[in-house]
Amino acid sequence: EWDKVIGTLSKEHTVYTIDLLGCGKSDKPAITYTCYLYVQLLTDFIRDIIGEKTDIVATGASASFVTAACQNIADQIDHIILVCPESIHALAKAPNHKSKLLAKIINIPIYGTFIYNVGARNTALSDSAECKYLYASILGHYTTVNVAHCLEGLTTSIAVITGKNAPETSQKADEYCHILPSIEHLEVPGSGLLPQRENANAFLEQIDLLLSDNC
């Protein structure tokens, strides 16, 4: 996801790319993954590993973890850049009886694994059967948080980058700007849901502009 921009960013910044628990090359224990878990992991990583003021660039549903973490350690976060974040409405969904039942069904060894293989096909969670526990947690709304509440009162510099060829991402960005008018919204031409891959040069120009006051 970030392979086309890491090299350039690393020339002027120390770059950490994190595979959160249950994702990518990280461990994938058979647990219920929650927003609180990811907030704690992110908070601990910034405090214990990075150990200095940090800029965060996150995509999609990770917006919930980042904004929630910022409430805990706002003094250690300089900039937040959200790339095509999930809508605030979608991230506000809380676990209910139906979603909890769905999560339990997916966690069933055989039948649940079949549902996972069909439902997660062609997604970032399709590379391993072990990912089904995170998939179940997402569908169960365990990984969501009230982002609108998290944004209120934040003074951290926040920007949203979207792809110009995906107008729905611009609409989602407007939700964030409506909650916190200080949020800056930038569009990357010639790109859709993954501007950092689809037009890496233009994406890097926007990142450089947003982080230029750090240099």
Task: Tell me what each language-model feature is.
Residues 7, 158-191, 197:
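Conserved loop-alpha-helix segment in the C-terminal half of the alpha/beta-hydrolase fold
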Residues 20-24, 87, 192-195:
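Alpha/beta-hydrolase active-site loop signature
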Residues 14, 53-55, 77-79, 184:
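Structural signature of beta-strand start/N-cap positions in the alpha/beta core
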Residues 3, 7, 16-57, 205:
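Active-site loop/oxyanion-hole signature of alpha/beta-hydrolase fold enzymes
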Residues 121-149, 165:
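Hydrophobic, aromatic-rich cap/lid helix
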Residues 58-66:
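Gly/Ala-rich beta-loop-alpha elbow adjacent to hydrolase catalytic centers
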